[in-house]
A protein has these predicted regions:
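Conserved C-terminal alpha-helix-loop-beta "cap" of PLP-dependent enzymes
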Residues: 22-26, 331-366
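Helix C-cap/helix->beta junction micro-motif
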Residues: 140, 200-201, 319, 350
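Conserved glycine-rich beta-strand-loop-beta hairpin in the small C-terminal domain of fold type I
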Residues: 285, 289, 305-313, 322-336
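Conserved core segment of the aminotransferase class I/II
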Residues: 78-79, 229-306, 313-314
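Conserved core of the PLP fold type I
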Residues: 60-197, 213-214, 218-233
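A short helix->loop->beta-strand "cap" motif at the edges of active sites that frequently abuts
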Residues: 121, 200-204, 236-237
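N-terminal small-domain helix-loop-helix segment of the aminotransferase-like
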Residues: 3-101, 291-292
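Walker B catalytic acidic pair
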Residues: 209
Length: 366
């Protein structure tokens, strides 16, 4: 009665962590500190409260599947600042759609890839992985081909050594920059090569850029899929980019962001939303517009994370010769002898909740 393909979703990182720690008590002398998921604890700007308040009556209206004009314009201006020149290849009515955060669309885009090739199909997924990428791959009806993100490749998957038979059958590929959880940043050439592969072999390239606005301020801003598409020409063919306010604006609970890309993908996604997925309520769209208009709060967040990493480096560098502050994101990916045992010790001794790396990854090639 229930599709057994989804049984694998029971094997997910947060459920595993709960099971690992459920019989262990944290140290009562310390406040519990959750460092096991990407939930910012910084405050949202006060103007968000104002936007939600003055638009209270809009809660009575069904939200459209497309962006309201205020949000479309704010997103386009944000793209002009973030990916200069990319606005020239974007039609705000055809290439952009608001989303309730990116977890849902990362999953649903897999449905759009289903039945786009004949026979057994493949989905290429970065490993370690965010669980929505796996869910989307399953929904595409494909067998997952895991690509390891290793330190020798700046914690990005090596996309140039994918077997031809996998590329021929691929319907969707998920990559992430800055990478989750390592914080590795893809170069422009890397992203261009990914787009060229998608176009040559006819699959959807889904680029998760949810951490794209969290980076070290002494480094250049990360480039993105739109920069790569612009450098290749004047279109967004085969590409879809995911952007969220959860990390950029400390707005995880607001569930707001956008996807931008190939008109055919966006058009199908709008139809999917209209028939059975979640549009973004108008008050949230208006609050999201105000957040995309403002850069100051995001800069403050980057400063905060920079300071945190400097403190961590001071304490951990003596114990880790190869300690490196990640170029992007706000996670710290540390090599330990036994990740599960380390998680239990940190919980029992310091009330610190961390995620064992093995829970975010699949064992591939030993």
């Amino acid at each position: 009665m229930v599709n057994s393909d989804y049984n694998v979703l029971k094997d997910w990182m947060f459920g595993k962590l709960n099971f690992l720690l459920e019989d262990l008590d944290p140290n009562p002398n310390y406040s519990i500190l959750k460092m096991s998921l990407g939930e910012p604890t910084l405050k949202m700007p006060d103007f968000v409260r104002h936007e939600l308040s003055i638009n209270f009556n809009e809660w009575g209206k069904y939200p459209p599947s497309a962006a309201i004009p205020e949000l479309s314009n704010s997103i386009l201006k944000y793209i002009e600042r973030r990916n200069p020149g990319a606005e020239k290849i974007i039609n705000i009515n055809k290439n952009i759609v608001p989303v309730p955060g990116t977890r849902e669309p990362l999953h649903l885009v897999g449905l759009l890839a289903k039945n786009t090739k004949v026979g057994e199909t493949s989905a290429i997924v970065t490993n370690p992985f965010y669980h929505a990428w796996r869910a989307g791959s399953i929904s595409s009806g494909s067998k997952i081909h895991w690509l390891n993100a290793l330190p020798e490749n700046q914690y990005l998957p090596n996309i140039l050594n994918i077997p031809e038979k996998i590329l021929d059958t691929c319907v969707i590929m998920y990559i992430c920059s800055p990478s989750n959880p390592h914080g590795g940043i893809a170069s422009l050439n890397y992203l261009k090569n990914a787009i060229l592969l998608a176009r040559k072999y006819g699959f959807i390239l889904a680029i998760d850029e949810c951490y794209n606005d969290i980076y070290r301020l002494n480094k250049p801003k990360p480039v993105g899929g739109l920069d790569a598409a612009l450098s290749l020409g004047d279109n967004l063919d085969n590409l879809i980019v995911f952007n969220s306010l959860s990390k950029r604006s400390n707005a995880s609970g607001m569930r707001a962001g956008f996807i931008v890309g190939d008109e055919k993908i966006i058009d199908s996604y709008k139809l999917l939303v209209s028939n059975g997925a979640s549009p973004v309520p108008i008050p949230i769209q208006k609050a999201a517009a105000s957040l995309y208009d403002d850069e100051e709060h995001n800069t403050k967040a980057c400063i905060h994370y920079d300071q945190n990493f400097q403190i961590v480096e001071e304490y951990l560098k003596p114990f880790y010769e190869d300690f490196k502050i990640p170029d992007g994101g706000f996670f710290l990916w540390l090599k330990v002898d036994d990740d599960e045992e380390a998680a239990k010790i940190l919980w029992k001794k310091f009330s610190l909740r961390v995620m064992p790396g093995r829970y975010m990854a699949k064992e591939v090639d030993g």
